[in-house]
A protein has these predicted regions:
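C-terminal catalytic "cap/lid" subdomain
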Residues: 2-452
């Protein structure tokens, strides 16, 4: 039986808890060659999660590995390419994986639950809210939810593609404070330390848009995610106000050290007299001081946006797959920024075939004074500024674009709304003016580098 990692003297119960999401890839918990679960890592993850719970925090684990464990259970050497075989192995492996998690957590008397999601569960607003409410209720009950994509039901066209993206959505859904993306690297560097002895680790990334992610950096033979997907996940999570951390998966105990350090650092840097009522990170660390906390191991943290996009607006931006594009002029964009709806007069063109209440991209383009050689009243390619749920489908918007709202009924024979999209159904991307982060590189265990 594992030793109880809880230390009553360090318990922070009674303080406002933080919500910590830990994402584990297949390569972190399943041996790439033998396909055996790496029990030593699983055990350390369990001890880390329970330690966080004893510190008063709430924990969610997003765990891959079902297919990898299924390969071992059925003595299959290589990951198959056919979807039906992958789905079958996922069904087999998920049972075994959850059995392992439950057995390990049971030693420390920590209840867990299983949540399996597909992209369709996220794109449907009612199911999204149901999943959100279930997760929040489980956290209130002191349960650790273990989340995975439902690979048995998901098909290629609607898969998340990797659990990095899923973990970011879960973190946003739960209003988490931290998302830990566990990987085979310690952190980001300002240059490749293998070729530049003066390379320095990057502790904080403020402007994630300045990072050039090498999406060609593939995952392991068992997994689907590489470094590019982690940068995408960090972008999603930080936009929802979640501090995102990349750190080494083989040392999960680092999570506790990093959380405690960041808690103490936040408290230390808070101006005297600041109200802690609005800052759970400060409230949860009343008993910590910066001097008393061990300096954390190497990691890179991506800072959250100061004005996060949450709940319905996050769901519109990141939970839905867009079915088309609406090209708008600068005046329409200014109106949207000013909290007005999207009027047809500001619509220049439409692309794609979408229906009423489906999601579309909003792209700002330059309006021409007269049609160009291509017959268009605009020139692009333009800049995507957000997403919207539309009140009219493609055929209707093509007919009413450029017209005043009072003309809609005359043109269509009816007028469901004066707006192409109501303002509450528009979610705009935020453009942050933040310090530029230098070109970053990630170094993996084998010594290779990945430009980020």
């Amino acid at each position: 039986m594992m030793a109880d990692p809880g230390d009553p003297t360090s318990s922070m119960k009674g303080h406002h808890p933080l919500i910590v999401v830990i994402k584990l890839g297949t390569s972190s918990i399943v041996d790439e060659k033998t396909h055996e679960p790496i029990l030593s890592i699983l055990t350390l993850i369990v001890e880390t999660a329970v330690r966080l719970r004893k510190d008063g925090h709430k924990v969610i684990i997003v765990s891959s590995g079902a297919i990898g464990v299924g390969l071992r259970r059925m003595d299959v050497e290589k990951r198959p390419k056919h979807l039906s075989k992958l789905q079958a192995l996922a069904a087999i492996g998920q049972c075994r994986l959850m059995s392992l998690w439950d057995s390990l957590f049971e030693h420390l008397r920590q209840p867990i639950s299983q949540i399996l999601l597909t992209r369709n569960d996220i794109s449907d607003r009612t199911r999204y809210r149901n999943a959100q409410n279930t997760i929040l209720e489980l956290l209130e009950m002191g349960v650790i939810p273990i989340v995975n994509e439902n690979d048995t039901l998901a098909v290629a066209e609607i898969k998340f593609g990797d659990n990095d993206t899923l973990s970011a959505i879960i973190a946003a859904m739960a209003h988490a404070n931290f998302l830990f993306l566990m990987t085979d690297v310690d952190c980001l560097y300002d240059k490749n330390p293998r070729t530049h002895p003066d390379a320095q680790p990057i502790e904080e990334v403020e402007d994630i848009s300045a990072i050039r992610a090498d999406v060609s950096s593939a995952g392991s033979s068992l997994g689907t995610g590489g470094m590019g997907t982690k940068i995408v996940a960090a972008r999603l999570a930080t936009s929802a106000g979640v501090t995102t951390v990349i750190t080494r998966s083989s040392l999960p105990g680092n999570i506790v050290k990093i959380v405690r350090y960041l808690q103490a650092r936040k408290k230390h840097n808070s101006p005297v007299g600041d109200s802690e009522a609005e800052d759970p990170l400060s409230r949860s660390t009343a008993s910590l001081s910066l001097d008393a906390v061990e300096k954390p191991p190497l990691h890179t943290r991506f800072l959250p946006l100061p004005q996060p996009i949450r709940d319905r607006y996050f769901w519109i931006l990141h939970g839905l797959a867009p079915h088309g594009t609406i090209y708008i002029d600068a005046g329409a964009h200014r109106a949207l920024v000013g909290k007005a709806g999207l009027l047809p007069v500001g619509v220049l063109d439409v692309e794609g075939n979408f229906a009423q209440q489906e999601s579309v991209r909003l792209v700002v383009v330059e309006r021409r004074s007269e049609p160009g050689p291509d017959g268009k009243l605009w020139e692009g390619p333009g800049i995507e500024v957000g997403r919207a749920l539309v009140n009219y489908g493609t055929p209707e918007i093509i007919r009413i674009r450029g017209h005043r709202s009072r003309e809609i009924e005359t043109i269509l024979g009816y007028a469901d709304s004066e707006y192409v999209a109501d303002r509450e159904n528009v979610s705009l991307l935020l453009k942050e003016s933040r310090p530029v982060t230098p070109v970053l590189e990630m170094v993996n265990e084998s010594g290779g580098s990945t430009v980020a």
